């Protein structure tokens, strides 16, 4: 398995969960992963020119990957769209979208056989909640990126998944700084912290890995909310309620 952004948060959770399953784990991140047994290379995905060489160093000799998880991403600031600069939006797009294009292109060019590619997306990609700006736009673009590449990976299943709320460093910001009165979506997030609705990174990673094979029941290139797999009735009711608004 190959994971991006594996030094902390969900990416580190995936690495730990995969190692516990006895899998061979490859990863890249800016800071490096501290878990023993991970084949790791430091790589700033925002520095596009350096990414192919880092991947070649990491995956030299690897002929097949059962699973690639495109996890690396940034949130940006929660604030009005009017106050969000093109530079900020560009940074979100660079990390959350275009770095993944570079990785996907490299996998095609290098000829490594890949069974499944999963991009870590978000409900923000479809909800359009106030203040989420570059994060929402870039995750929506990631969903479409994977849909488009599904035509170019005929022997690989691609999907974007919204993994649900996860208690990572991102939540330290979301649960403290932005005003939930101004940005209503934060109310649900803050109420969920400390409950089973918001597991830690390792538990969240385990939850995704338990259902990752079932993503193949959807068309390649699909966007899937994890609740469609673990709580389909709850998800259907939620979507129905939103449509009535």
Q: Which positions does each model-derived feature cover?
A:
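Catalytic Tyr-X3-Lys loop
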Residues: 82-101, 142
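N-terminal Rossmann NAD(P)H-binding glycine-rich loop of SDR-like oxidoreductase domains
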Residues: 7-11, 15
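Rossmann-fold cofactor-recognition segment
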Residues: 36-49
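Catalytic loop of short-chain dehydrogenase/reductase
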Residues: 116-141, 146-154, 162-166, 172-175
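Short alpha-helix in the Rossmann-fold core of NAD(P)-dependent oxidoreductases
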Residues: 93-100, 130, 138, 197
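Rossmann-fold scaffold of SDR-type NAD(P)-dependent oxidoreductases
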Residues: 4, 65-73, 96, 119, ...
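C-terminal helical subdomain
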Residues: 160, 179-239
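Conserved mid-core segment of classical short-chain dehydrogenase/reductases
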Residues: 73-90, 131
């Amino acid at each position: 398995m190959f994971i991006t952004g594996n030094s902390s948060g969900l990416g580190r959770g995936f690495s730990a969960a995969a190692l516990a399953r006895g899998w061979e784990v490859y990863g890249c991140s800016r800071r490096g992963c501290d878990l023993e047994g991970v084949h790791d290379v430091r790589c700033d995905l925002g520095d596009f020119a350096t990414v192919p060489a880092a991947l070649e160093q990491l995956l030299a000799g690897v002929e097949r990957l059962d699973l690639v998880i495109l996890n690396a991403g940034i949130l940006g600031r929660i604030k009005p769209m009017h106050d969000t600069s093109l530079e900020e939006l560009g940074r979100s797009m660079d990390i959350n979208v275009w770095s993944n294009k570079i990785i996907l292109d490299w996998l095609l060019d290098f000829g490594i056989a890949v069974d499944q590619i999963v991009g870590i997306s978000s409900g923000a990609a479809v909800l359009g909640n106030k203040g989420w700006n570059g994060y929402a736009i870039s995750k929506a673009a990631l969903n479409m990126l994977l849909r488009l590449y599904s035509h170019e990976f005929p022997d690989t299943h691609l999907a974007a998944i919204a993994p649900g709320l996860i208690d990572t460093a991102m939540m330290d910001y979301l649960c403290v700084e932005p005003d939930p009165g101004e940005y209503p979506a934060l109310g649900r997030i803050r109420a969920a912290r400390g409950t089973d609705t918001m597991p830690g990174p390792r538990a969240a990673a385990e939850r995704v890995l338990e259902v990752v094979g079932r993503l193949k029941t959807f068309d390649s290139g699909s966007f899937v909310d994890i609740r469609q797999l673990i709580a389909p009735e709850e998800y259907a009711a939620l979507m129905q309620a939103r449509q009535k608004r």
